[in-house]
């Protein structure tokens, strides 16, 4: 009997562990259900803007008329009544809707045409702005191409170096011309000296004539 009483209390502690596991798993299911409830379609503000823009009433659209239009589109108005009121107030503060009558969420509402016109103009101007940026980028890229002629200018500078080398080659020619002049002057001086030596040559020519005249005398 004592053995059975000691072993019996050991089994129950396993049950609270299982209960803890079930408690942890349950909140996960609830979180998954909350995520599934989020609407995947358009927001309440978008639906209100569509309903007001589609209406042809000049005096504006009342809250009751909005609810009818949204209910006809399949929107649950009863569950999302608070969201509709908050969306209406937010649209009025932003300026997308103008409140013609009443205050708060009650009354009648119209679309703010001025803001819509500005949005349309901004939407039309936005595509034009990227084109201007592209042209500006193209204009910046265009001047980059003339950088290549710099190499040509560097090549054009090389003839200057060739000219300098040609001038350097011409400069040694000048001393050669000077040397030629000096050489030409020296033979001229030598040519003047032999003039004095010509006088004895004439005397030598005169002597043989006298010898020839002496030979015929013995023949007689």
Curated annotation (Swiss-Prot):
GO terms for molecular function: DNA binding; structural constituent of chromatin. The keyword DNA-binding applies. Residues 40-113 form the H15 domain. InterPro entries: H1/H5, Histone_H1/H5_H15, WH-like_DNA-bd_sf, WH_DNA-bd_sf. Gene3D superfamilies: Winged helix-like DNA-binding domain superfamily/Winged helix DNA-binding domain. Residues 122-134, 141-151, 158-196, 204-220 have a biased composition (Basic residues). Transmembrane segments: none annotated. It is found in: Nucleus; Chromosome. It comes from the Eukaryota. Its main location: nucleus. Residues 28-45 have a biased composition (Low complexity). GO terms for biological process: nucleosome assembly. The keyword NAD does not apply. Residues 1-45, 99-220 are annotated as: Disordered. One of its GO terms (cellular component) is nucleosome. Keywords: Chromosome, DNA-binding, Nucleus. Pfam families: Linker_histone (PF00538). Histones H1 are necessary for the condensation of nucleosome chains into higher-order structures. Belongs to the histone H1/H5 family. This is Histone H1B. It comes from Xenopus laevis. The lineage of its organism: Eukaryota, Metazoa, Chordata, Craniata, Vertebrata.
């Amino acid at each position: 009997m004592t053995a059975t009483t000691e072993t019996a209390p050991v089994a129950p502690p396993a049950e609270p562990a299982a209960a803890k596991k079930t408690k942890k798993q349950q909140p996960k299911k609830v979180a998954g259900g909350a995520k599934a409830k989020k609407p995947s379609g358009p927001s309440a503000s978008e639906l209100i803007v569509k309903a007001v823009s589609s209406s042809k009433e000049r005096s504006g659209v009342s809250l009751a008329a909005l609810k009818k239009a949204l209910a006809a589109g399949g929107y649950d108005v009863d569950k999302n009544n608070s969201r509709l009121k908050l969306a209406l107030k937010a649209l009025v503060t932003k300026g997308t809707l103008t409140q013609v009558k009443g205050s708060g969420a009650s009354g009648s509402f119209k679309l703010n045409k001025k803001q819509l016109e500005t949005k349309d103009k901004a939407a039309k101007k936005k595509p034009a702005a990227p084109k201007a940026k592209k042209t500006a980028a193209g204009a910046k890229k265009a001047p980059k191409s003339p950088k290549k002629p710099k190499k040509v200018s560097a090549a054009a500078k090389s003839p200057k170096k060739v000219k300098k080398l040609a001038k350097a080659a011409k400069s040694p020619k000048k001393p050669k011309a000077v040397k030629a002049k000096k050489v030409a002057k020296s033979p001229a001086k030598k040519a003047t000296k032999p003039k004095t030596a010509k006088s004895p040559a004439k005397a030598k020519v005169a002597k043989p004539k006298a010898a020839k005249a002496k030979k015929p005398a013995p023949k007689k």
